[in-house]
Amino acid sequence: MDAGVRSTVKFRTTSIALIFGIAVCATFSLAAQKKPAATPVPVVFAQDKGRLTIKLGGQTVGHEEFEIAPSGGGWLAKGVAEIKPPDGGSSKVSGSLTLQPDGAPISYDWSAQAEKTNGAHILFANGVASITLQMQGARPFQQDLTFNTPLIAVLDNNLYHQYAVLARIYDWSKRGVQSFPVIIPQELTPGTITVQSTGSASADGKTYEGLKVTTSDLEILLLLDGNHRLMRLEVPDAKVSVIRD
């Protein structure tokens, strides 16, 4: 499979009001005192669902169906991509990422079907990603990757909706350059990315909000609508374009 399609990244992060202290006054009346409510965890996500067309050198090589939705007390971002490059065999990859409302990952499962079927389950806790990898015909392999923060970006091969998740994790109130640790699960690769708002950007006669993602060897441009939904993704050096249908 062409390297540009195989991976766009190669190197590879209730409010409970406390009522306490019942005070007894001289006449034995009771008064409940209430502490200020704890600051609620911010919710950075919005429900989204769509289909992406994946192009390499202007030629369609695959599609991805995805959905980002509330799940329990958190959020679930899941997608399935089918890739068939002109000079290689077809493959199918799926990913399911469970997240805290603030964007920190809780767990991730992926499965890739090509000549063999491989997959993994990852649990995130206290900045540690505990990975159990299952390769067809091999014993399960376990590995831990340690990060210095629980807010880790998960950007897996050929699952471009995960850049929509990244666009939500980016702090738009601060803007500027923001760095995130990142994990590429199918490659067991950790690394660091920087994300920066580029302001207004245009493509095919349409205007978007631009967000630039920089890795050690690639620049990825995310084009978002006014609600920061991913509409288009461009990787110029790899000649990859991903366009929402």
Q: Which residue stretches match the model-derived regions?
A:
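Solvent-exposed helix/loop surface patches that form functional interfaces
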Residues: 40-47, 61, 114-209, 234
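N-terminal secretory signal peptides that target proteins for export/translocation
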Residues: 1-12
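Short, exposed beta-strand-loop hairpins at the edges of beta-sheets
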Residues: 213-214, 220-237
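Bacterial Sec-dependent signal peptides at the C-terminal "C-region" and cleavage site
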Residues: 27-37
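A short, Trp-centered hydrophobic/proline-enriched beta-strand micro-motif
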Residues: 46-54
